[in-house]
Swiss-Prot record:
It comes from Cronobacter sakazakii (strain ATCC BAA-894) (Enterobacter sakazakii). The lineage of its organism: Bacteria, Pseudomonadati, Pseudomonadota, Gammaproteobacteria, Enterobacterales. It catalyses: Hydrolysis of terminal non-reducing beta-D-galactose residues in beta-D-galactosides. The record marks H367, H401 as: Transition state stabilizer. This is Beta-galactosidase. One of its GO terms (cellular component) is beta-galactosidase complex.
Length: 1043
């Protein structure tokens, strides 16, 4: 709770020595969350001009204190000398505010997910408690000293802090993610004023801030002074009500003035651009509340609005409400202004609705994190994230797991994103998680974090849901705070996942990582499949996954399954992917080279290594390939092939409110990646409308021998929007079309290849090509063309992959999960096999030379029979092509294989490769709905994905032809080309440490296991994407490039 001592008591404390103030030990007392901090309220700017307030121009009443402060660092608050309050210390260094001191060279950033970064002994924290001492000299305008009141506003300080001004103690605060304001009126004077802020890294609040993130400290959000007149607006709440017809609305503004005075009145004016829609002026004083009367300092104003433009993420129409306090003569004293969005959020008949329409949440979780600035995120970074989210078909964001800066909500309201605002509460590392949530000693601390969030942020139309916090179990505190919010703000639902995602403290079933079809029977809190959950007896609430599709590294497999379910079952209303961006930190070496660091790279303990990197984008916001899968599945236009002749498709708009007034549909028919027919038309669809479009009255006339015929459609925006550039691609689809039956064109017979047999090799020659197969190994050890070797290592079976994060799960050196795929592969010996050639024979046939080799793979040190058998049939034909037919048989004792394919190292050469298959981005068998079948060309550098923690990457599936360096591969296969071999990927901890090898590694897979992604700590690859068969067969052809 907030401690507000009597004036006499506090005046006595103000002048006490620093050591006396620190001896209060407020940071280890959950009953004290602040001292002398002002009550929470919606943001104030103190405009003296209502027009400037309406336009949102900078206020003369606000003085930013961002910039350089002097900073000294100590290992403990008790080491800070008293003299610091009067003058900077000799070791003080200029440090930017806002910033985290760990990003400025002090102390160590710590990344941990669940484990607390300190020994668990609430409310106590270690005596060794890193402490930052910030100081700055300021001058305030003389007019501010003569009249009115001046307060200082800290946007965010982690974890707790004390404030002094001119040597006098002003107050104390904790809760690192909400503003803290203090009145400085009595301590400011003319000339230089010295501000001193002592920030503690750890406090009892640390036990409530156990979020999965980097643990950093300091003044990391803006700091400013605000000057208000003696009679000022203390709080301004605005909210809207819509009639069921949506044609009539009322804007309410509940205003509080401090101090109350006779004769004051308040004006509420609503503006749309330069047009005033309506206004009202009322004297101060509320209607009677109870038998004891009314609030003299409050008034509620209301404006009726007909046919308002409604706010949604699709059509973010905003108005501006300006509230002005008038003196007894009707003269303006001060104004405040807020964006207003007319919208109604409800849960009706088991559906979350906005303006009467059921929402489909295309959401993502977002931490405030910047690779160079830590948790000090500026407006440019916020806008960058919002634009990328909108461009990739997201319509919602969850503030995981704490309130963001006020500017974030304003930007979401203006660009159009639905927001879940979440209280800064997580006790994931407690055992049980509910320990503090059910302890009345902590009730006040919990309560302030929830109630202050609501009071501060409730005016933002983008916020459609409140969240009580994250992963804190379920206690009586949650029920109490749920009821408080429902009483204070009945216009929004409340969600909370803790305690099983469906407790009485949530209006929405909001599980994390629940599967589509499979139950997870976790003790006490079973996690049902999402389809089952909504059908449980008596359950009528909507289900929205607060976290799903764990996007850690090479992930997001099975994502399409979620979206098929969302579209099939109305009460499955989407979810929030975990999460937006990799939380890595940029490190700069003395030579200027830069790389991205994760947990443990700073010597931080405890740490959870690379588990901070779960993003759809890299730290610099470059997309992961998984982002394209999310964009495609979430696209607002859905397509269906109706007929091939005439060529017709059906297009359905999933927009709820906007017409397709800026969309162009382009279509093409490709034959083996070459465009044969194309066209475009303007796409005109109303909200939620469908339309059949005829692309060609006569269909497509295929020629004899045509194959791989595909119809492609894409929707682009010809005009730029506030969030997208001209020509932005918003949706796409493709279908294979029927190919005519035809016999292949006969090929003139060429010269027969010649077979030479030596004691060691079978040597085959055809023209200027030579192939050598070792009789001992049964492997192709040389392929030369014009005397130039094409392969640097033998062409060999490959059954392993460099483990991806989803393969590793929670396994670490000190904590092994035997159920993780990588541990099962290790235990089965897949990474430690011994190859033996059982037989290798060659013969000349009518069509060429045939070599048949039998291979066996034994687990080293295991006396049992072979784990895997392979049979290769290699044929060099009279065209100089090498055909490889491969049969695989595996032991029933083996776990599912990561891959069934071949690998070799090729000589270097061309810088680009082209292929006919799925692309252009990386794709895997369970993550390929966004990839399109066509002919693609990319630089080799873009054929690998530089996941910060290296692993399997860069696969392109369903390939029919691959061309590189003068040769081509044909067949039906998946491939990758990489300068890094599997072993190096396995043995290297960071991408920047990889060293290009002598050539380029080629993998050709007949089969490849999925990557999974329902979560990253259980084996989440679905059965249909596991390689569990006992036998496999595939084939491919290698030849000199044709044409």
């Amino acid at each position: 709770m907030t401690e507000n001592p009597t004036t006499t008591a506090f005046n006595e404390l103000q002048t006490r020595p620093l050591a006396t103030i620190l001896a209060r030990n407020d940071w280890q007392n959950p009953a004290i969350t602040s001292v002398n901090r002002l009550p929470s309220h919606t943001p104030l700017h103190g405009w003296r001009d209502a027009d400037r307030a309406r336009r949102g121009e900078p206020s003369d009443a606000v003085l930013s204190l961002d910039g350089e402060w002097q900073f000294s660092f100590f290992a403990s608050p008790h080491q800070v000398p008293e003299v610091w309050l009067a003058a900077d210390l000799s070791d003080a260094r200029a440090t930017p505010v806002p910033s985290n001191w760990q990003m400025e060279g002090y102390d160590t950033p710590i990344y941990t997910n669940v484990r607390y970064p300190i020994p668990v002994n609430p409310p106590f924290v270690p005596d060794d408690n890193p402490t930052g001492c910030y100081s700055r000299d300021i001058e305030v305008p003389q007019a501010w000293l003569e009249t009115g009141r001046t307060r200082i506003i800290f946007g965010g300080v982690n974890s707790a802090f004390y404030l002094w001004c001119n040597g006098q103690w002003v107050g104390y605060s904790q809760d690192s993610r909400l503003p803290a304001e203090f009145d400085l009126t009595g301590v400011l004077h003319a000339g230089r004023n010295r501000l001193c802020v002592l920030v503690l890294r750890w406090s009892d609040g640390t036990y409530l801030e156990d979020q999965d993130m980097w643990r950093m400290s300091g003044i990391f959000r803006p700091v400013s002074l605000l000057h208000l007149p003696e009679q000022a607006l203390a709080d301004v709440r605005v909210h809207t009500e819509l009639a069921p017809s949506l044609r009539h609305a009322t804007l309410f503004s509940e205003v509080e003035v401090t101090p109350a005075a006779c004769g004051l009145s308040v004006t509420l004016a609503l503006w749309h651009g330069e047009n005033e829609i309506a206004s009202q002026t009322l004297p101060l004083g509320s209607a009677p509340i109870d038998e004891r009367g009314n609030y003299a300092e409050r008034v509620t104003l209301s404006l009726d609005v007909d046919n308002p433009l409604l706010w949604s993420a699709e059509t973010p129409h905003l108005y501006r409400a300006v509230v002005t306090l008038l003196d007894a003569d009707g003269m303006p004293l001060v104004s405040e202004a807020h964006d207003v969005g007319f919208r109604r959020v409800e849960i009706n008949n088991g559906l979350l609705t906005l303006n009467g329409q059921p929402l489909l949440i295309r959401g993502v979780n977002r931490h405030e994190h910047h690779p160079e600035k830590g948790q000090a995120v500026d407006e440019a970074a916020m806008v960058q994230d919002i634009l990328l989210m909108k461009q990739n078909n997201f319509n919602a964001v969850r503030c995981s797991h704490y309130p963001n800066q006020p500017r974030w909500y304003e930007l979401c309201s203006r660009y159009g994103l639905y927001v879940v605002d979440e209280a800064n509460i997580e006790t994931h590392g407690m055992e049980p998680m509910s320990r503090l949530s059910d302890d009345p000693v902590w009730l006040g601390a919990y309560s302030e974090r929830v109630t202050r969030m609501v009071k501060c942020n409730r005016n933002h139309p983008s916020i459609i849901i409140w969240s009580l916090g994250n992963e804190s179990g379920n206690g009586a505190t949650h029920t109490a705070l749920y009821n408080w919010i429902k009483h204070q703000d009945p216009t929004r639902p409340v969600q909370y996942e803790g305690g099983g995602a469906d407790t009485r403290a949530t209006d929405i079933i909001c599980p994390m990582y629940a599967r589509v079809e499979t139950d997870q029977l976790i003790p006490a809190v079973p996690k049902w499949s999402i389809k089952k959950w909504i059908s449980m007896p008596g359950e009528t609430r909507p289900l929205i996954l607060c976290e799903y599709a764990h996007a850690m590294g090479n992930s997001l497999g099975n994502f399409a399954d979620y979206w098929a379910a969302f579209r099939q079952y109305p009460r499955l209303q989407g979810g929030f992917i975990w999460d937006w961006a990799d939380q890595a930190i940029t490190r700069v070496e003395p030579d200027g080279s830069r790389w991205w660091a994760y947990g443990g790279d700073f010597g931080d303990t405890p740490n959870d290594r690379q588990f901070c990197m779960n993003g759809l984008v890299f730290p610099d916001r470059t997309p992961h390939p998984a982002l394209f899968e999310a964009k495609h599945q979430q696209q607002f236009f859905q397509f269906r092939l109706v007929s091939e002749n005439p060529l017709q498709i059906e297009v359905t708009s999933e927009y709820l409110f906007r017409e397709s007034d800026n969309e162009r549909l382009l279509w093409s028919i490709e034959v083996r990646g070459e465009t044969r027919l194309s066209g475009e038309l303007t796409l005109e669809l109303g909200p939620q409308a469908s339309r059949v479009l005829t692309l060609s009255d006569t269909g497509f006339s295929a020629r004899a021998g045509d194959e791989e015929i595909w119809l492609h459609v894409r929707v682009e925006q010809p005009q730029a929007t506030p969030w997208s550039p001209e020509g932005h691609l918003s949706a796409w689809a493709q279908w294979p079309l029927a190919a005519p039956l035809a016999l292949p064109e006969p090929v003139a017979a060429g010269d027969a290849p010649q077979l030479e047999i030596t004691d060691a090799e079978f040597v085959i020659r055809h023209g200027c090509q030579t192939w050598r197969v070792s009789r001992a190994s049964g492997q192709l050890i040389q392929w030369s063309d014009d005397g130039v070797d094409q392969i640097l290592t033998p062409l060999a079976d490959q059954f392993i992959r460099a483990p991806i994060d989803n393969d590793i799960g929670v396994s670490e050196v000190e904590r092994i999960d035997p159920n993780a795929w990588v541990e099962r592969w290790k235990a089965a010996g897949l990474y430690n096999t011994e190859h033996r050639c059982l037989a290798c024979d060659a013969q000349t046939t009518r069509d060429g030379v045939e070599i048949v080799a039998q291979h066996a793979y034994f687990v080293k040190g295991v006396a049992d029979g072979p784990a895997i058998l392979s049979r290769w049939r290699m044929v060099v034909d009279n065209q100089g092509a090498l055909h490889c037919d491969i049969d695989i048989a595996r032991s029933a004792a083996l776990p599912p294989l990561p891959r069934v394919g071949v690998v070799c190292q090729l000589r270097g050469g061309e810088e680009t490769a082209s292929w006919l298959g799925l692309g252009p981005h990386e794709n895997y068998p369970d993550r390929l709905s966004s990839a399109c079948f066509s002919r693609w060309t990319l630089p080799l550098s873009e054929l690998t994905t530089p996941y910060i923690f290296p692993g399997e990457n860069g696969l392109r599936c369903n390939t029919r032809e691959l061309n590189w360096n003068g040769w081509q591969a044909e067949g039906e296969f998946h491939f990758s080309l990489s300068p890094y071999g599997t072993r190096q990927l396995m043995e290297t901890s960071h991408w920047h440490k990889l060293q290009p090898e002598a050539g380029i590694w080629l993998t050709i897979d007949g089969f490849h296991m999925g990557v999974g992604g329902d979560d990253s700590w259980t084996p989440s690859v679905h059965p249909e994407y596991l390689l569990t068969a006992r036998e496999y067969r595939y084939r491919f052809t290698l030849r000199r490039r044709q044409g």
